[in-house]
């Protein structure tokens, strides 16, 4: 799952201290604690079992960054709350579900002077960076039109998603739930917002 996988990645970043973990499901926090232990790192404070346990994590004084990898409908509210409590935030895609939520994140970031970053990994994968380099080197000539999409088949993971939230979005959008996965690399090739 996304959260414990992220914890494993963070253990490899020199100077990073993972001081608190939170998940609605206690067993996921325990899995992340095991990852810390196997990496030779100290246990982190644990928050779980309550819908609002994450707020207690955000209210701590010893946290600089809150990494948000929850169900999507909570991303924006969690990001806003964390920034309002003095934390920078890194939010898995999508960072928000509506334009109003996007503006809430932007306005809160500007008001609090805290960074808010949507974590869009697909613009940095091997294929995407190779294609971008080829476009920048002129291999394709002048690029005038680009299309992108991202279909994510999650059948093998259906039982792992709490309350089936992820599958509901996949069914509603036919699996193409990350516009940024397909369009982010396309925007890079076209030099949009660079």
What function would you assign to each model-found segment?
Residues 2-3, 112-117, 122-194:
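Predominantly a Rossmann-like dinucleotide-binding segment in NAD(P)-dependent oxidoreductases
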Residues 20, 100, 136:
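FAD-dinucleotide binding site
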Residues 29, 75-76, 98, 127-128, ...:
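Short, well-ordered alpha-helical microsegments
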């Amino acid at each position: 799952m996304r959260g414990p996988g992220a914890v494993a990645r963070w253990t490899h970043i020199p100077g990073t201290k993972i001081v608190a973990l939170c998940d609605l499901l206690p067993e996921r926090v325990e899995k992340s604690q095991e990852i810390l232990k196997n990496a030779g790192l100290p246990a982190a404070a644990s928050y779980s079992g309550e819908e609002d346990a994450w707020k207690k994590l955000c209210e701590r004084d010893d946290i600089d960054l809150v990494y948000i990898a929850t169900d999507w409908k909570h991303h924006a509210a969690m990001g806003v709350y964390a920034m309002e409590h003095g934390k920078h935030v890194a939010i898995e895609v999508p960072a928000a579900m509506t334009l109003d939520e996007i503006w809430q994140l932007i306005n809160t970031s500007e008001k609090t002077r805290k960074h808010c970053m949507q974590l869009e990994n697909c613009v940095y994968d091997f294929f995407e960076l190779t294609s971008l380099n080829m476009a920048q080197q002129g291999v394709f000539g002048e690029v005038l039109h680009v299309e992108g999409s991202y279909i994510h088949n999650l059948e093998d993971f259906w039982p792992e998603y709490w309350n089936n939230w992820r599958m509901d979005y996949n069914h509603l959008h036919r699996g193409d739930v990350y516009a940024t996965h397909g369009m982010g690399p396309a925007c890079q090739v076209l030099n949009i917002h660079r």
